[in-house]
Amino acid sequence: MRIEEDLKLGFKDVLIRPKRSTLKSRSDVELERQFTFKYSGQTWSGVPIIAANMDTVGTFEMAQALAGFDILTAVHKHYTVEEWAAFINTASADVLKHVMVSTGTSDADFEKTVQILALNPALNFVCIDVANGYSEHFVQFVAKAREAWPTKTICAGNVVTGEMCEELILSGADIVKVGIGPGSVCTTRVKTGVGYPQLSAVIECADAAHGLGGMIVSDGGCTMPGDVAKAFGGGADFVMLGGMLAGHEESGGSVVEENGEKFMLFYGMSSESAMNRHVGGVAKYRAAEGKTVKLPLRGPVGNTARDILGGLRSACTYVGASRLKELTKRTTFIRVQEQENRIFNSL
């Protein structure tokens, strides 16, 4: 046993220090980025935000809506091959360019993903997702996926430390998904005591990944547009959002009514709700590591997407970054004990 003495930080622990700017308007900021990925060789351009691969966020409907904003969607792994085929038959090439195919690490998951990718060559992204990316089995699966799909861009996670980020990149991942426990409906940290404050994880993993020519996506911990800006400022190439995109018409959650008001269910993918729905319940040897919440219906996701992108543009203007690409270089974080004046937050 040992204790690391250096303090690790989350998004709530910092603010971005403003700097002189020559920008005249938020409209001058370019949020689109262009990436060429280490192994696939694919070049992609768009806004590097990803809707999370949760079945109450990463739906086909979400992909259709967010493609209009140049945003990616990691479509959840619980759609059947037949449902994928129906979606592909109606989706435009531009929508498919903004879709990631999610998979687990079982043999059945692999075979299903093979079938889905064979439906259309425009499906260029694979998101290999497990809660704990530290297992040898997971690393071996990433290597297997790279061998099977040499021209696909592979995103793999989740991890939170530089050395594991490096191992996944060396095993074939183009992008490493970073985050253990920061999600709004994740309870891993309280159930297990395991985790890592998200901003520090992003900073450390970005440094490790970029040294090898890889990239990272910050997954979890964002509660507002300012957190998205902080994730990019900390070095994230992509930012994945779950709770911020939940509760919308396109989110796919079940709608319930209480006292005449309608709510949408949103749950973590290791929650009892998710396991009851997809694997017949919580196995005797494990505990649920997620919760279920009821969110007031939030209407079309487009309004939220515009708010997030607007906040991101504004953050760039405050530090003089004319392009999102410049935000990291122009970010100085300051440690704080307050974020906002909360006097009217309860109203």
Swiss-Prot record:
Gene Ontology molecular function terms on file: GMP reductase activity; metal ion binding
Catalysed transformations (reactions): IMP + NH4(+) + NADP(+) = GMP + NADPH + 2 H(+)
Domain of life: Bacteria
Organism: Salmonella paratyphi C (strain RKS4594)
A Pfam entry, by short name: IMPDH
CDD domains cross-referenced by the UniProt entry: IMPDH (cd00381)
UniProt-listed Gene3D superfamilies: Aldolase class I
Gene Ontology biological process terms in this record: purine nucleotide metabolic process
Residues at the active site: 186
Family, per entry: Belongs to the IMPDH/GMPR family. GuaC type 1 subfamily.
Keywords: Metal-binding, NADP, Oxidoreductase, Potassium
Function: Catalyzes the irreversible NADPH-dependent deamination of GMP to IMP. It functions in the conversion of nucleobase, nucleoside and nucleotide derivatives of G to A nucleotides, and in maintaining the intracellular balance of A and G nucleotides.
Subunit structure: Homotetramer.
Listed name of the protein: GMP reductase
EC number: 1.7.1.7
Residues that, per the record, bind NADP(+): 108-131, 216-239
GO cellular component, one term: cytosol
Binding, K(+): 181, 183
